[in-house]
Structure formats: structure tokens, C-alpha cells
From Swiss-Prot:
CDD domains: F-box_FBXL4 (cd22117)
Repeat region (LRR), residues: 71-96, 120-145, 151-176, 194-221, 243-268, 277-301, 310-335, 336-361, 362-387, 388-412, 413-437, 439-463, 464-491, 492-517, 518-551, 552-578
F-box domain ranges (all copies): 20-66
Keyword terms of this UniProt record: Leucine-rich repeat, Repeat
Region Disordered, residue ranges: 632-656
SUPFAM superfamilies: F-box domain (SSF81383), RNI-like (SSF52047)
Superkingdom: Eukaryota
Signal peptide: none
Keyword Repeat attributed: yes
UniProt-recorded name of the protein: F-box/LRR-repeat protein 10
Length: 656
């Protein structure tokens, strides 16, 4: 079959090119039919190649049912022409980081059945209100960070408009702090929610509000304050909450009021140690899963604001939990400082269907938990033992007997040594291995090359301070094709540019590379990565979507020349030390507005410390080719960045 090749050059200016004339011979209807199979980001990429395809894309965008772009924040000037003509849009998923209230009329329309808007910091409650008034047939709604910008707010009326108007909602995720806008007694407004709701996720709400929502007060003759179970949310199967403090009362209310619950994820981050009457105890755990349908449970107490734990839960509470959770498939427990091996072991030996087991900060968890794991019928695929300081290699050797392990998170287990790597190197399905802070050596990591490295997709050795360049030369010697996509080499004091040369030379298609706080990494590493050709027909550095160079000691303004286009065309997140040269950093951010430049040491990407995400209802779209950004941005900004560099060079000359 003959193929038609579009040959384009000059940043998309293809007048007179042979490829465009060939495309003109094809019926527009044929091209448009093919384009209906593509997502919006791909359509925009096509539109940047030639006039024929741009014309077809323009027509397709008037009737495409789905508009999903999460990898870049679009401006109002870009969104308006893309969305305005489309009256058949049913699903809108967008990063609104550069939009505000002026975009409400463009975004909100009656035809929508799914809305997922992230980074809505510059929107007020008007966005929520308008969705309730216009989107009567909405099935899925996810709103993130609404009104977080100073001066924006959300009223109770806005939430009432939403819950009254969207009477067919099945999925509702309000990922912002509701407690800032609702009074203590306002939790009952959720009584207006659709009875079709099966998935509810709230960014933050007080335990008191949640308890009020799930209980109702009946007034009768002799018993004027009898509290009964509410029928609100009775069809909810998945509930994810962040509350001020997890208490027995809220756990009891959830268990008794949600008879259909399958998945419960609740966490808190108290500002101080809770009092006994307002904390979770053994009796609270006894209330979990009253209806016996729960398959997935996550109870996390974070130390984000204060070093506090579930101090009133003991091994007895774990015995209660194990008795009620025999059919559990996923269990995640964090902050249970009084629970010992006996408690955790009871969970493992009671839940025969368990496939995912996570313990965050288990200070009393030791190797004995896994001593006789072979006596169970467990088939674990995901295990996380983060910050369990008493674990040693012996525990991992026992755990590795489960050959179905795909994800192993051992971050903060500082007593693990090379014997751990010997054990995990024989796991044929292992895709994720996180070893932050472990006491491992170059020799230990070389064991991975003997087996598991071919399947490994993500590897983190952050803070493993014994490591040198040698392990990089061993792993990336080019002798085999690697599946590795994510690599965290942060806080390795002995890592130098030579290690990055080995990585670049191997051509490994890394999409996420973290080098923060590597003091010996400098400009040479950036140049090597920028010059990498992952595939023969790709642009240099084409695979990297995230690059974190924060606090790398050798980075100077020279690196910024290699961070401009055409280098790193897929880069969406960049971490850098702002003090290198603030003017050049600002110029780079203006030149590449869709590149999120972080200068304050924030962790990049969406992988939070506690893995609090909504990947199940968000469609994560892979970073597209640079044509998308090119189509949106054009050629603006080159001169501005060059001027900043020239000024910097002049200042340096004057100082000399």
C-alpha cells in the first residue's frame, strides 16, 4: 500500500510542500473520519503540520464529543476557538491553571455529561453555581483547587445550586477545602446529592460535618433527639475523604450509613494530638465493614503538620479489624504506632484475598511479620512498607517468595542492605522498586541487572548515600533493552556528570529523571541529556517529561541555553534553583508557558507523599509531541530569552 508522507519544515510553515499537495488529493471526509479516532492533543499536533490538516482539524473540533487535555494549561485565547463552536461536547477534562471566571461561559454548557477541571485556583464559587444551573445531565464532576487564589471564595448557595441542579451525578469529587466555606452545621446540604451517586471524594471536610451528613435527627414525643441512620449516600460504593481528625464517631457513621460501600479511603493530618473523646480507638476499628462488602480500606494519619499518631489503637483493634475484613483485597494503614507484629500479622493471615498491603510508619513492625508468610495463601502484587525502620533483609527475603510482586515500596527502611537486592532481583514481574534511604551499595544494585531490570519501569534510590557513578555504568551499559521510564537519583552526594553520561549514552527512554540535591551534577549533564537521541527519528532529549535539577551544585546559566527549544520538546516539569539567575529562569518560564518551572524545591509531578490521587476517575494523558505546544504558542518569546541571556552576560563582563 502506498503511503502519504507529510514533509514539513520551518516550524510548521509548509506552503508548497509536496506532502500537503498529496493530502489535497484525499477527500476531506476521509481525513476527518480518521481524525475522529484521535484525542484533542493529537489533533492540535496534526493542525500544526500543514494547512490541509489544520482545516480538517478545525471542522472536527466542532463536533468531537471529548475534549481532554491535562498535560498543559491552556490560556483563554487558546480555549475559546477550540471549544466555542462545539455544541456536541459531552466530556470536558482540562487543566485550568491559566483560566479564571471569565472562562465559565466557554467551559460550562448543557451538553456536558462529564466535567473534570484541575487547578481551578482563579475560579470562584460561580463556577460551581453555573455547573449546577446549566449541566442538568451531568454524570461525573471533578473540580480541583477551586478558589484557592487569594480573593476568591465559595458560598453555601453555590454548593446548593450544584447539588440541586445535577440530579443525575454518579461521580462527585470536590478536591478543595470545604471547611473554609461551610459552617459547622452545613454538612447537611449534601442531603441534596443525587441518589445515583456511587463515588464521592472530598478534598477536606471536618469530621463533625461528615457525621452530620451521615446521620439525621428524628423528633418524636418522648425521645426528641434520637439519632438515626440517614439515607443520604446510601448507594455510594467508593468514599475518599480528608478530615481534620478520624474519630470513632465518623467511622461508625460511615459504616452504618453506607450499606453499599466497597472502597473506603479516609485520612487526617491533625494540628495537635487529639483528645481521647475525639480520636480513633480499638472500638472504632470494630465498627468498620458492618455490611461485609468492603474490599479496599485505607486509614492514614499523616504527620504533615504535627508528629501525631493513632495512639489509642492497639493490637486488639487489629484483631477486631481482621475479624470484619476477611474478604479484603487492599489494606493501607498509616500512623499506627502502638500496633506490633502480632496485630499486623493477624491482618495478613486473616485476609486470604489480599493483593495490596501497605504500612506507613510502623515503628514496631519487625521481620517477624513475614516470618511464616509461606504458610498463607496470599498472592501479593503490591507491598509498601514505608518508614518501617526495624525491617531488615530477612523480611524482604521472605516477602520475595511471592513471585507475583509488581510494586515494592521500601522507602525509609534504612536497615536494608545488598541482600535485599539479591532477593528482589529474582522477581520476574517487578515493575516498581523504591529504595530511598536504604544502606545499599553499587554492588548490590548490579544484582538487578541479572534479572529484574528488564521488567523494571520505576526505580528510586534517593538518599542511598553509599552509591557512586559505578552502579549507573553497570545498569546502563547498553547491553540490553530497558523498560525503565522513571529514575530518582536525588540526594546522592557521590554522583557526578559521568553517571548521566552513561545514562544518555545508553539511550534509555527515561520520561522522569530526578537529580535534586546532587551537588556534583552540573551543566555537562544537562547538555548530555539535551543531546540524547532515544529513537533515531526523534528530536534530541525527546523522552523526558520531568527533569528535577533543584539544588544541583554545578548548574549555571549555561544550562539554560540547552533548556530552550528544540531541546527537551516533551518537558512539562522542570525543577531548578531560582537563585542561579532569576531573570533567565523567568524568561524561560515565559518562553515555555506550558512548562511548569519550580524554583522553591517543591516535589514535581502528581505523586504526593501519601499517594492521594484520583487516577481512577481522571484520564491521565501522556505528554504529546512538541507540535501541540508549538501550535498553541507559536514562535513568541525567543527574543525575550535571548535578551535576558545577553543582559546576564553583560553583567558578568562588567563584574570581570
Amino acid at each position: 500500500m502506498a503511503t502519504t508522507t507529510v514533509v514539513c519544515g520551518g516550524g510548521g510553515d509548509v506552503e508548497g510542500c509536496d506532502g500537503e499537495r498529496s493530502l489535497d488529493l484525499l477527500p476531506a471526509a476521509l481525513l476527518e473520519t480518521i481524525m475522529t479516532k484521535l484525542d484533542v492533543a493529537s489533533l492540535c499536533s496534526l493542525a500544526s503540520t500543514c494547512k490541509t490538516l489544520k482545516s480538517c482539524v478545525t471542522r472536527v473540533l466542532t463536533f468531537t464529543p471529548n475534549f481532554h487535555i491535562f498535560n498543559v494549561s491552556l490560556s483563554m485565547e487558546t480555549v475559546r476557538p477550540l471549544l466555542f463552536p462545539n455544541q456536541q461536547l459531552s466530556s470536558l477534562k482540562l487543566d485550568c491553571g491559566r483560566l479564571g471566571n471569565s472562562a465559565i461561559d466557554i467551559l460550562v454548557r448543557p451538553s456536558l455529561r462529564e466535567i473534570s477541571l484541575h487547578n481551578c485556583r482563579d475560579f470562584s464559587g460561580d463556577l460551581i453555581s453555573e455547573i449546577g444551573r446549566k449541566c442538568k445531565d451531568l454524570r461525573l464532576l471533578c473540580l480541583g483547587s477551586v478558589a484557592e487564589k487569594v480573593g476568591r471564595s465559595i458560598s453555601r448557595c453555590a454548593l446548593e445550586d450544584l447539588l440541586n441542579g445535577c440530579s443525575h451525578l454518579e461521580v462527585l469529587a470536590l478536591m478543595f477545602d470545604l471547611s473554609l466555606y461551610l459552617r459547622p452545621g452545613d454538612g447537611r446540604i449534601f442531603g441534596l446529592v443525587s441518589d445515583r451517586l456511587t463515588h464521592l471524594e472530598l478534598g477536606h471536610i471536618t469530621s463533625r460535618m461528615m457525621t452530620q451528613l451521615l446521620t439525621s435527627t428524628e423528633i418524636s414525643g418522648q425521645d426528641s433527639n434520637r439519632v438515626t441512620t440517614s439515607t443520604v449516600l446510601q448507594n455510594v460504593q467508593r468514599l475518599r475523604l480528608s478530615v481534620d481528625c478520624i474519630t470513632d464517631a465518623v467511622v461508625k457513621a460511615i459504616s452504618k450509613s453506607l450499606p453499599s460501600l466497597i472502597d473506603l479511603d479516609i485520612r487526617d493530618a491533625p494540628l495537635e494530638d487529639p483528645r481521647q473523646v475525639s480520636d480513633l480507638t480499638d472500638f472504632g476499628l470494630h465498627e468498620i465493614n458492618q455490611n461485609g462488602k468492603l474490599k479496599h480500606l485505607s486509614l492514614i494519619r499523616s504527620q504533615e503538620f504535627h508528629p501525631t499518631y493513632f495512639r489509642r489503637v492497639s493490637d486488639q483493634g487489629m484483631l477486631f479489624l481482621a475479624d470484619k475484613c476477611l474478604g479484603m483485597e487492599t489494606i493501607c494503614l498509616g500512623g499506627f504506632c502502638r500496633v506490633t507484629d502480632a496485630g499486623f500479622k493477624t491482618i495478613l493471615h486473616s485476609c486470604a484475598s489480599l493483593s495490596k498491603f501497605s504500612i506507613y510508619h510502623g515503628p514496631k513492625l519487625t521481620d517477624l511479620v513475614f516470618h511464616d508468610i509461606l504458610a498463607t495463601t496470599l498472592s501479593l502484587s503490591h507491598v509498601s512498607l514505608r518508614r518501617c525502620h526495624l525491617l531488615t533483609d530477612h523480611a524482604i527475603q521472605k516477602l520475595a517468595s511471592s513471585l507475583k510482586l509488581e510494586n515494592l515500596d521500601l522507602r525509609g527502611c534504612r536497615n536494608l542492605r545488598d541482600e535485599t537486592l539479591t532477593a528482589v532481583s529474582h522477581l520476574p514481574k517487578l515493575k516498581v522498586l523504591l529504595l530511598d534511604g536504604a544502606d545499599i551499595s553499587d554492588t548490590g544494585l548490579s544484582y538487578l541487572k541479572e534479572g529484574v531490570l528488564d521488567s523494571l519501569v520505576s526505580l528510586s534510590v534517593r538518599g542511598c548515600r553509599n552509591l557512586t557513578d559505578k552502579f549507573m555504568s553497570t545498569l546502563f551499559d547498553g547491553s540490553s533493552k530497558l523498560a525503565l521510564r522513571e529514575l530518582d537519583l536525588s540526594n546522592l552526594p557521590n554522583l557526578t556528570d559521568a553517571a548521566i553520561f552513561a545514562l544518555a549514552k545508553s539511550g534509555a527512554p527515561i520520561t522522569k529523571l530526578q537529580l535534586r540535591e546532587c551537588r556534583l551534577i552540573g551543566d555537562a549533564s544537562v547538555m548530555a541529556l539535551a543531546s540524547t537521541r532515544v529513537y533515531e527519528d526523534e528530536c534530541p532529549g525527546s523522552s523526558l517529561c520531568l527533569l528535577d535539577l533543584y539544588d544541583c551544585g554545578g548548574i549555571t546559566q549555561l544550562s539554560f541555553k540547552w533548556l530552550k527549544k528544540p531541546f527537551f520538546p516533551r518537558l512539562k516539569w522542570l525543577g531548578i534553583t531560582g537563585s542561579v539567575n532569576r531573570d533567565i529562569v523567568d524568561a524561560l518560564a515565559r518562553r515555555r508557558p506550558h512548562l511548569q518551572v519550580s524554583c522553591r524545591g517543591e516535589e514535581l509531578g502528581n505523586d504526593g507523599e501519601d499517594d492521594w490521587d484520583s487516577a481512577d476517575i481522571h484520564q491521565h494523558i501522556e505528554a504529546q509531541e512538541d507540535e501541540l505546544e508549538q501550535w498553541i504558542l507559536g514562535d513568541e518569546g525567543d527574543v525575550e530569552m535571548e535578551d535576558a541571556e545577553d543582559e546576564s552576560e553583560e553583567d558578568a563582563s562588567e563584574e570581570d
